[in-house]
Amino acid sequence: HPYIGFHNPEGSNTGEYDDDCDIDERLWASAELLRTDTTHRDTYLKAFEKYSSMTHPEVSKTDFGWTDVSGMATLCLLTDPGNTCGATRKREYEQILFTEADRLIELQTKSGFELSMQPEDFVWGSNMVVCNRSMLLILASLCSEGDTASRYREAALNQLHYLLGRNALDISYVTGEGEHAFKNPHNRPTACDEIDLPMPGWVSGGPFKTPCDPAAIAAVP
C-alpha cells in the first residue's frame, strides 16, 4: 500500500485515532510469531531483528497504548520460557524495561500521590497511561528478584491506589469499586439499561489536561 498509516476517512465525524507508523505493530507480530510458530522461526527471527533495529519517535518498546504497541513485543519476549529471541536481545529488552521502570519510580518520588505521571501525561484517556505504566512495572517485577522486584511491585500498586481513590478528587475511577466511585461513564449500554447505577468494572478515561467542553472551560481558569 502506498500509504502506511491511518486517518479517518472523509465524512467521518468521530474522534480520530490516527497512526502514521506501523513498525510497532510489525515488531509485536514478529515477536508473537517467533514465540509460537517453530516451523518458520528463521523467517520470523529475521523480521523481528529488522523491526527491533528500526527507530521511530512513536516506538518506545515500553508502551502498551493504542498508538504504540511495541511494549507488547517486550512483554512477549520477556515472558517467553523458550527465550527464542536469543540471550543478547533478551538482555537488551530487559535493560530497556528496567530503565523505563526506574524512570517511573523516580516520577513517583516527585508526586504527592506517588503516581508515575507528569502534567503532560494527562492526555485524553490519561488513566490508560496510568494502567499501562502499572503493567510495565509489574513486568519489571516479574523479571527481577528480591528487593528490586518488591520495589517495582509496590510502584505498580501505587498506580492502582490512584485509580481506586488516592487522587486529588478522592474518587474511584472504577465503577462499583469504593465508597466514592464515579457513576456516569460515557457508555451507551449502561446508560440505557434503565438501572441508575452503572455496570460495575468500567474504568474512567480520567483527567484531561486541556478543557474541551463549555462547562469545563467555564470552570477551569
Predicted features and spans:
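Internal amphipathic alpha-helical repeat/solenoid segments
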Residues: 6-8
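Aromatic (Trp/Tyr) and acidic
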Residues: 13-54, 68-111, 120-221
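Zinc-dependent metallopeptidase catalytic helix centered on the HExxH motif
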Residues: 57-67
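Long, compositionally biased eukaryotic scaffolding/regulatory segments
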Residues: 113-115
